[in-house]
Each structure stands twice: as C-alpha cells, then as structure tokens.
C-alpha cells in the first residue's frame, strides 16, 4: 500500500491526483494522499505496480469455532429480521459444519487430530441457539452429547475448570486454560452459559466457583465471565 517515488514518477499526470514527493511522506515511502479522484488510467497503472509484488499471507484455513459463531449470528439476526430467511441459512450452514467438522471426531481446522475447548463451546452454543429458534429437538440432543464429550475431554476435575487442550497422559509441562477474552469471549464463560441452558446445574455451580476465583485476579480480561456468572 506504499510506493517509492521511482515507481510513481513515470506515471503521466499522477501529480495532479496525488501528493507525491521525492522524499516521500512516510519513512521515505509514499502513502497515496488524494488531491482529487484519479482517473481509470492512473488506477490501472497503480494496480499494475501492485500486481508485481509478493502478496501478503492469507490464512485460508476454516475453523470450527468461528463457523459456529457465524451460525449463532444468523440465528440472532433472525430474531430481528424474521422474514429474511436467516434461520434457514443458519440451519443449512450448520449442516455443512456437521459434514465437514463433525463427521467422525470434532476437529478445529484442517487437522482431524486436534480440537480445543472453544470448538466445543461454540458448537454447543450454536446448537442451543438453533434449538431455541426452531424447537427441533435434534439440536438440543446433539448439544448435550457434545457437552458430555467436552467434559470428558477437557474438564480438569482437580481445578474445576476446562483446559484449552484435550486431556492426555503426556501432559507434562503445563495445561493451558482459556479464561481471558481475546477476539472472542473465553470458552469457559461460554461453557458456563451452556451448562445453565442445558440444565447441568451441578457442573454450572462448580465452574462458576472456579471462574469467580479467577475474576479476583484477572477481572479486566474476563468481561464475558461476568456476564456468564
């Protein structure tokens, strides 16, 4: 998105449309600052320069947790615009998720050997959202099944909290836990809400006590946990 003066100086009349100087306007390079809307010929020349460059990395992998969040978003949108077909889109999209991510084991992305607690958390959440909106019992049945799986695979019974990775016998050094909100609400908060929605009262009580303990230290990073509690 930046250019050198040498790249631009031979484009006819470019100085009429952009403020370009030999010394540049950002660390010796030029960020194009429009003086007026450029014509198609100028844009074509600029694109020709850019097409010769190495393109930035683009992450093409699909993630289960993000796709499930999209389903929940469609369900929420349906509650506001019920006649626009968003609920049907959500159901169709979930069918693709089930086919591509859940046909054998739950997996996070392209590797069928890896899954994380956030995958289960958001999968269960989207199933419960679909269940509440469609009243189709199959979604709630699946949500309960995956919740049981999540407890078996990720729940640390000693610390009363979900760890990020699956429990394995070779957990030697550390067991990372997901309690802080980053780009998404943390998985333990989502699982606490899932427990409550499914009627897993004992599990919800146990997890809420653990999250409340972490809140005393990390409350600035656990906004979603406050909501869950």
Question: What spans do the regions from the language model cover?
Answer:
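Glycan-recognition and catalytic cores of secretory/periplasmic carbohydrate-active enzymes
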Residues: 1-229
